[in-house]
Amino acid sequence: MSLIHRYQNNGYNIVLDINSGCIHVVDEVTYEVLPYMEEGLDTAAIVGKLGDQFSEEDIKTSVAECEKLKADGMLFTRDVYENAIDTFTKNRQTVVKALCLHIAHDCNLACRYCFAEEGEYHGRRALMSFKVGKKALDFLIANSGSRHNLEVDFFGGEPLMNWQVVKDLVAYGREQEKIHNKKFRFTLTTNGVLLNDEVMEFCNKEMGNVVLSIDGRKEVHDFMRPFRKGAGSYDLIFPKFQKFAESRNQDKYYVRGTFTHHNLDFSQDVLHLADLGFKQISVEPVVADPSEEYALREEDLPKIMEEYDLLAKEMIKREKEGKGFKFFHFMIDLTGGPCVYKRLSGCGSGTEYLAVTPWGDFYPCHQFVGEEEYLMGNVDEGITRPDIQKEFGCCNVYTKPACKDCFARFYCSGGCAANGYHAHKDIRSNYEIGCELQRKRVECAIMIKAALAED
């Protein structure tokens, strides 16, 4: 298993020291020297290998500099985390930090790619009652231990179809904060159909983040996100989303889209949203059954990779022109970020994070809702399947065979358990197309950092 990852992008020779996280932008000599150093060749042998390409002096200088970086723990560092994560997993006390409240298993759109089947999640249409939501918040408080900051996402379906209950639960949460010394961060995901000034005003006061669903260009959005009778939704929601983003000072929100086989030129959708003034953008690859006509295929990968490269270059250009924006999948923290245990074990689904259905059932996350083998309990009885919690708690990059040799493992934390389950019926497996795209996004994100660091 290599300890470094080398790649070339946009004219940069980039070397990632996988286990330390150090990034090196190197010259041609060093780029070619490094593989031989990792093989264990000495300076003389490397000169013999590369002497017809570079001068002996340049090769010796490069080797000496790399040896210094190695001695300083910045190159060819070893993985010291496998035993540590095992100990951490066995000894940590699980606390619940976040809930995804399915406030509405109903929707007013009929999006073609919806994993929730128009909000029904393979079941019945339903709205969460205040009573069930209250019990969910009580469960979160009771199972959060000493943790002060808690998160609750209002999700659907379409949450605004049950707006009064959203408001009532926020009010209840604020009351409980004072009693239990907790702080709730509420978030909301909406398709915008029912968005109005009253909703915006409430969200700007109470919601730490809002996710606004829009796929990009009008023709793309209207094809994938129509009303049930077939009409498009772009013209209705777009001006409302613009107003909402401005009312939040272009912060603490995302416009979030999905690209599919039908719009492989998705960089144009990202740039369309940026041109309309949005500063916080996420356009993500669809995850779908391969039989769906909109599903991404292996043969789509070269085009998708090309699009990520195009987008990265355009983002650098716009940033230098003072017209920059954030793209969620290119956001990477090279100086701080989560602790190593978080980076190795992922999002916390099934342990620190749970989804709650309208009738109060617990699942590991929203993408497992309806999968009865992963029904974990309910708001009345609590967790009745601790074995599921344990199964998810033991899920990390070292228990996923495909992750052990992947250079991006400290950035993706092993990927999405639901994607692995839906691809191979195993939460420790990986969705291969998703892994390929994740690696590409990490490469682009690092390249952007390198390019902007030059100025």
Predicted regions and their residues:
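Conserved alpha-helical substructure of the radical SAM core
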Residues: Q53-F54, K60-T61, E65-D72, F76-D79, ...
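C-terminal accessory region of radical SAM enzymes
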Residues: P302-G336, H366-S413
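Short acidic, hydrophobic short linear motifs in intrinsically disordered regions
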Residues: G40-G51
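Short Fe-S-cluster ligation motifs
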Residues: L137-F155, F392-C394, S429-D455
